[in-house]
Amino acid sequence: MIELAPAVHLSPRNWPMRASLAILGLIALVCLIGPLVSGHPYDQVYRDYVLARPSPFAHPDATETREALEGIARRMRLRVEASRQDGEVLHLALSADRPIDPRALRAFERSDVFRPARIVETRDAGRRLSVDVPLKRTVFLFGTDANGRDLFTRTLIAGRISLAVGLLASFVALTIGVAYGAVAGYAGGRIDALMMRIVEIVYALPFIFFVIVLVMVFGRHFVLIFVTIGAVEWLGMARIVRGQTLSIKQRDFVAAAEALGATAPAILWRHVVPNASGPIAAYLAVLVPRVILLESFVSFLGLGVQEPLTSWGVLVADGARNIQGSVHLLIFPALFLGATLAALQSLGGAWAAGTR
C-alpha cells in the first residue's frame, strides 16, 4: 500500500507559493521570448555604442551622431563642411583635397549609426559632395556592455543558461541521490555503512577543487557545468532519501511485499520512493536555487560558460569589474538573479511547510 505525502495546494492562504510561481513563470517567459523580439542577437557587437547607458529612447543622440560622423570623416580623410539633420536624415557637405571615391561612402553603412549614404550633388570635379545619410535607430533598454553588445538580450540569454543549469543539475542530483540513498537505506548493515562513508568522504572534498579538476581534465563545456554541480549536490539528496528509506522499510506494506516475493528494485520503485516523495520534492525545491547560485559562483570565478554564451554569474562578474563607470552592467543581471533566487527560496520554504 502506498501512503503518499499530502499534496500541496495553491489555496488563497498559500500566497507565498502563488507569488513565487508567478514570479518564476514571468522570468522564465521573458527569458524565453525576450531575445526573439529584442531585435539584437546576443553576440552582435555595436562598436559605436560601447557602454551605452540604459534608455527607452532610440539611439543615436546628437553626441553619438557627431562622434560617429567625425570618426568616419577621419577614416575617409574628408572634411565635414556643413551638417544639418532633417528628421531621420542627415544632410552633409563633404570635401577633400582630391576627388572623393563614391565607394568610400560605404563607411556610413558599415557603421551602427548610419544607413547607406546617397550622393545628391557632385561639385568641383568630385572634390565636394552633398550627401544624404539616413540615421539607423536602435534601442538599448539595458544599455550595452564593454564590447558593445546589447545587455537586455544578453541578460535574458544568461537567464536561459542559468535556469537550464539549475534544472538539469538538480535532475542529475535527484537521479543519483534518490537511487543511492534508497539502495543504502534498504540494504542496511555493512553496505549502508560503506555507502554512507563514501558520501562523507566526497562531502569533505572542496567543491571548487572538484570543479577545477574536472575543468582541467574535460575542458570548459556547458554540459560539464551541470554534471559537475549535480555530481556534488546529490550527496544531500542521498542522505535524505536514505533516512526516509530506513523508516519506510519498517512499514507493514513493505514486509507484505517482501513476503509476496517482490524483488528489492520493485519494492524500492513501487513502495519506498513514492512514500518519500514529499521530503524529496521539498528538498528539490530548495536545491534548485542552490544550484543556480553555485553556477553563478563558478561562472564568477571564470570557470563557467564560454563566450559568446553567458550566464547571470558571468554578467555579474563583468558588472563588478566595470562598476566604477557603468553600474548598469551589474544592476540588471543582479536583479534578475536575486529575484529568481528569492522566488525559488520562497517556493521551497512554502513547499516544505505544506508537506509536513
What annotation goes with each model-predicted range?
Residues 1-173, 322-342, 351-356:
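Gly/Trp-centered helix-boundary motif
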Residues 144-356:
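Alpha-helical transmembrane segments of integral membrane proteins
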